Amino acid sequence: MQISAALLCVLLTAAAFTVHVWAQPDGTNSSTCCYVKKQKIPKRNLKSYRKITSSRCPWEAVIFKTKKGMEVCAEAHQKWVEEAIAYLDMKTSTPKP
């Protein structure tokens, strides 16, 4: 009977740690997005972007930050998204007089 109680304690402890590990984030940024905007955003309204990859989402996403401070998710492989990224990269690499 003592062996059964000890075994039960070990199993419950192991189960508790397993649940704790599964509940941990996967190491990505907390602002991951799986719901993306399909509509094109004008480049002149964009300020910056960051790429997001997460095991929780089936695709790569980009989070654009607008000049008004809003964050908008978009699928990274859409043509307008690639053009917007190239535009922002060029804009930030161009030296200002």
Curated annotation (Swiss-Prot):
Asked if the keyword Glycoprotein belongs to this entry, the reply reads: yes
Answer whether the UniProt record assigns the keyword Heme to this protein.
no
GO cellular component terms listed in the entry, alphabetical order: extracellular space
GO molecular function terms attached to this record: CCR chemokine receptor binding; CCR1 chemokine receptor binding; CCR2 chemokine receptor binding; chemokine activity; heparin binding
Signal sequence residues: 1-23
Q: Among the record's GO biological process terms, what is one?
A: positive regulation of natural killer cell chemotaxis
Can you tell me which family this protein belongs to?
Belongs to the intercrine beta (chemokine CC) family.
Q: Report what the protein is called.
A: C-C motif chemokine 7
Upper lineage is:
Eukaryota, Metazoa, Chordata, Craniata, Vertebrata
